[in-house]
């Protein structure tokens, strides 16, 4: 087996502070220009986002370097990972457990160093760093017939430690149950063990002139970013109930990201707000609210419905970070609000990933599935979807969720990602 630290004379190492800054400056050419100057891009990354609880406690920059010159500023490629707790429910186990995942982002090779295989070397070595087995894993569908025991993935009881930590000293890598990324280059990452999963979304147009959103119930609460922490706690309780639901499949390991303090949602909103203040005229109206909480008819917190969103001022869209509804009426109220917000602030569309179609009575036929796979926008469920069209994303610049699995499993068990929504994107 190839060494975890070396591959044909190259190593992947945690970046020094100087390497991290150079990597950020390099990325500004690809992801900052022409809207942001290099200084603005660095400010976004280092001052605005780099000081958030999401970045400070979870982020790691990696760089691919020659094995004999690990601190060089002329490194070959770079990427980032974020350490993310997850909740895991296994067949045959009564209790939900906690484990670790890593999200991968900012995979970048400078133009002058491309077409040399550096990205492939880096992603291979990154898998070696994250996986307890120190290897590139099989794809999800190829693992279904396998039995894995003693994987070395860190797993703790639900009540062990507080929600954000594992009492492991913050060990980074070599302890993951899974990792995931959002591919902008189709299924390129499948050769390194990341399988595209859950790449469908519902898309709506903003409300047009004369259209009004559904009336909100008494007690509906609009949420500012700092108020999302409480919603994160509510959402965690709902996700725990969803994982523990005995009516679900007994042949699937089910997991979701565990973020009860809403660090990811708040990070994404802070990122989008930077664009609002940087790109829009000072006199232009800026959004104040990024979530809506609808109380249940019984007043029970567990039965509430809610949506969290951000404004993408580059693509001019409202991205729904989290959408939870307990009825078709609540769905209509939440979607109407999001579409109204899009209209108010000049957005061109709204998107929500992996909406719970079954709860709305939407059942896809084989013909529907085939049409989606061929790139057809499915519009025949507009009544149930409140004017929305169902879309399957493919190709470049489409942020395709892709998952790699490292942990223990029994033969025949599938892996099911619960709540695979926009709110975990990075």
Regions found by a protein language model. Name each.
Residues 64, 81, 109, 309-311:
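GNAT/GCN5-related N-acetyltransferase fold signature
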Residues 26-94, 243-298:
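Active-site rim helix/loop that mediates acceptor-substrate recognition in acyltransferases
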Residues 195-321:
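Amide-forming acyltransferase catalytic core, primarily the GNAT-like/NAT-type
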Residues 120-254:
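Contiguous mid-protein beta-loop-alpha structural module that forms a pocket-lining wall or clamp
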Residues 87-103, 311-320:
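A conserved beta-turn-beta hairpin within the catalytic core of GNAT-like acetyltransferases
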Residues 131-174, 285-302, 370-394:
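Intrinsically disordered, low-complexity domain-flanking/linker segments in eukaryotic proteins
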Residues 162-165, 172, 182, 186-217, ...:
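Active-site/acyl-donor-binding loops of N-acyltransferases
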Residues 106-109, 114-141, 328-343:
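Conserved acetyl-CoA-binding loop-helix of GNAT-fold acetyltransferases
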């Amino acid at each position: 087996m190839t060494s975890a630290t070396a591959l044909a004379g190259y190593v992947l190492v945690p970046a020094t502070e100087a390497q991290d800054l150079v990597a950020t400056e390099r990325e500004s050419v690809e992801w900052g220009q022409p809207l942001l100057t290099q200084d603005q891009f660095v400010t976004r990354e280092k001052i605005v986002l780099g000081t958030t609880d999401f970045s400070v406690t979870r982020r790691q920059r990696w760089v691919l370097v020659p094995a004999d010159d690990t601190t060089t500023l002329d490194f070959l490629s770079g990427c980032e990972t974020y350490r993310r707790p997850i909740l895991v429910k296994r067949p045959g186990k009564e209790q939900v457990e906690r484990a670790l995942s890593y999200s991968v982002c900012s995979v970048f090779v400078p133009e002058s160093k491309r077409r040399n295989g550096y990205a492939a070397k880096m992603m291979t070595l990154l898998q070696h760093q994250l996986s307890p087995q120190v290897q590139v894993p099989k794809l999800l569908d190829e693992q279904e017939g396998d039995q894995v025991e003693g994987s070395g993935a860190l797993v703790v009881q639900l009540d062990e430690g507080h929600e954000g930590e594992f009492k492991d000293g913050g060990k980074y890598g070599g302890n993951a149950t899974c990792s995931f990324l959002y591919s902008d280059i189709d299924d390129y990452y499948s050769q390194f063990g990341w399988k595209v999963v859950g790449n469908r979304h519902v898309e709506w147009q903003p409300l047009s002139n004369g259209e009004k959103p559904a009336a909100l119930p008494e007690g509906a609460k609009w949420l500012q970013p700092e108020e999302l922490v409480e919603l994160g706690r509510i959402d965690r309780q709902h996700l725990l109930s969803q994982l523990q639901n005995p009516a679900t499949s007994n042949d699937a390991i089910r997991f979701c990201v565990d973020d009860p303090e809403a660090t990811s949602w708040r990070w994404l909103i802070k990122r989008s707000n930077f664009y609002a203040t940087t790109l829009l005229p000072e006199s232009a109206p800026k959004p104040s609210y990024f979530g809506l909480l609808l109380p249940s008819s019984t007043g029970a917190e567990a039965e509430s419905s809610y949506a969290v969103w951000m404004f993408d001022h580059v693509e001019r869209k409202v991205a729904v970070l989290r959408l939870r509804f307990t009825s078709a009426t609540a769905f209509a109220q939440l979607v109407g609000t999001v579409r109204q917000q899009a209209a108010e602030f000049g957005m061109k569309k709204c998107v929500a990933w992996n909406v719970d179609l079954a709860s709305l009575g939407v059942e896809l036929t084989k013909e529907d599935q085939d049409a989606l796979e061929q790139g057809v926008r499915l519009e025949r469920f507009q009544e149930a979807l409140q004017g929305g069209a169902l879309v399957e994303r493919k190709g470049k610049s489409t942020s395709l969720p892709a998952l790699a699995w490292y942990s223990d499993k029994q033969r025949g068990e599938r892996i099911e990602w619960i709540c695979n929504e926009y709110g975990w994107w990075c």
